[in-house]
Design a protein with these regions (language model features):
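Regulatory and interdomain segments flanking nucleotide-handling catalytic cores
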Residues: 1-159
């Protein structure tokens, strides 16, 4: 798509929705967004906030769905999770044999997709020589760093 951002994001969200729906036999929808921010600091802050937000949402979702699987209604499960501290949510899961800290990182904080430079063997038809060329490929990272390390990780990819 020649890096047309909105098109790429639209296609990725649609592909994720379709794949998840087919795999689980029920409709699902994923969204994506583009945010134009005026400087690097705000970009890093935004991504750090999204990273923490993903963690909060995952903890809430694990608590909610654990309660739903135990037979709680939508409203009772929602009410039971609402107002609990982070520690109380961890305890609730642990009491039900779920150690949130041992879940895969991508389930707790999401994952990253970004361009990565790779070397590829090639042939130059004009010179008749073999050689290596640099190419940009999309890389999926399921083990993102935390805290300040995550901020440095984001900054490294935007400058």
């Amino acid at each position: 798509f020649k890096r047309k951002t909105r098109k790429i994001i639209s296609v990725l969200a649609g592909e994720a929705s379709a794949a998840f729906s087919v795999a689980h036999g029920q409709p699902a929808a994923f969204d994506a967004r583009v945010c134009v921010l005026p400087n690097e600091k705000l970009v890093v802050d935004y991504f750090r906030w999204r990273h923490e937000d993903a963690h909060r949402n995952a903890l809430n979702a694990h608590c909610y769905w654990m309660l739903r699987k135990k037979g709680e209604s939508v409203s009772r499960a929602t009410d039971a999770v609402s107002g609990l501290t982070r520690a109380q949510k961890h305890d609730l899961l642990f009491e039900n044999s779920i150690n949130f800290n041992e879940l895969p990182a991508w389930q707790k904080r999401g994952f990253g997709v970004y361009f990565q430079t790779t070397l590829k063997e090639g042939f130059n038809p004009q010179t008749g020589e073999n050689g290596q060329v640099e190419r940009q490929i999309l890389h999926t990272d399921f083990e993102l760093p935390l805290g300040d390390d995550y901020g440095a990780f984001v900054l490294e990819r935007i400058v």
